[in-house]
């Protein structure tokens, strides 16, 4: 039995080194990944499986032809298509996990404005899994299902194997207003101090300037006495990720047109 927060991680499905076992691990990890995130694209699958794009294209075509995946064309992301689950895939997952599953994502329910953002979140987690840094994760959709409420949700929550702690993942795709940033800081403080949902917040983006902007504005807000925010608390609990490799990866796969 695979823990629900580990579903989608390919290594959790590999029962032997046989060709069939490796194929099944790819298939079921992908189905669980899509179930948890709602949809995905070829660029995310490349990272998740750690294979070449040609392999991904060949495999997803087979899954589409087999009636497992629904391929949806879109101009809202660089890959120009995303993949959803078909009823057959849900039945396969229900049989695998021995439980009833509900999946209500349809092409009409996907917000085009958030597709790239959501794919980048998946990219960050897949990259962390590939690097051996993430043990398990909780998606934003799952936080919503767990009745944590809109004001407490982040893009994802992960278990950081290196630091042995829960961390929140936040992806910045644009500059935010000062009131919005102030609200976010208060939400982070509550989630960390009162609710014990995670210990740190990690800020990622496809461009260094958005990470820098978040750091600059947050520093200004936390240092202002009238906001009643502990500057040292946020310096300890918010980390701004300037990893050049990851920023370039995100930009080239999800943003560059």
Stretches found by the model and what they are:
Residues 1-103, 107-108:
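Nuclease-adjacent, charged terminal/linker segments that flank catalytic cores
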Residues 2-3, 11-17, 21-33, 39-42, ...:
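Non-catalytic C-terminal interaction segments of nucleic acid-processing enzymes
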Residues 72, 112-115, 125-167, 175-177:
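Active-site metal-binding core of divalent-cation-utilizing nuclease and nuclease-like domains
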Residues 105-121:
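A short, highly charged nucleic-acid-interacting micro-segment common to nuclease
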Residues 141-142, 171-173, 204-208:
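Structural motif
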Residues 175-186:
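Active-site-adjacent loop/helix micro-motif of nuclease/hydrolase catalytic cores
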Residues 186-195:
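Short, basic/hydrophobic alpha-helical segments
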């Amino acid at each position: 039995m695979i823990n629900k927060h580990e579903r989608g991680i390919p290594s959790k499905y590999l029962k032997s080194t046989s060709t069939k076992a490796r194929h099944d691990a790819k298939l079921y990890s992908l189905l669980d990944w899509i179930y948890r995130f709602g949809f995905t694209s070829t660029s995310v699958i490349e990272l998740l499986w750690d294979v070449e794009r040609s392999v991904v294209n060949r495999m997803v075509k087979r899954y589409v032809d087999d009636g497992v995946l629904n391929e949806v064309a879109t101009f809202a992301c660089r890959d120009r298509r995303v993949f959803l689950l078909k009823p057959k895939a849900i039945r396969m997952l229900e049989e695998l996990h021995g439980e009833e599953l509900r999946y209500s994502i349809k092409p009409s329910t996907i917000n085009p404005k958030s597709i790239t953002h959501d794919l980048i979140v998946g990219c960050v987690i897949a990259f962390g899994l590939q690097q051996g840094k993430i043990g398990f994760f909780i998606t934003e959709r799952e936080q919503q299902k767990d009745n944590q409420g809109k004001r407490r949700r982040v893009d994802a929550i992960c278990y950081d194997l290196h630091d042995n702690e829960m961390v929140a993942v936040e992806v910045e795709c644009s500059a935010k207003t000062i009131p919005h940033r102030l609200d976010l800081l208060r939400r982070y403080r509550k989630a960390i101090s009162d609710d014990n949902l995670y210990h740190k917040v990690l800020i990622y983006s496809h461009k260094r300037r958005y990470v820098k902007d978040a750091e600059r504005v947050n520093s200004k807000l936390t240092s202002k006495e009238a906001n009643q925010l502990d500057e040292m608390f946020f310096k300890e609990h918010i980390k701004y990720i300037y990893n050049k490799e990851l920023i370039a990866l995100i930009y080239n796969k999800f943003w560059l047109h």
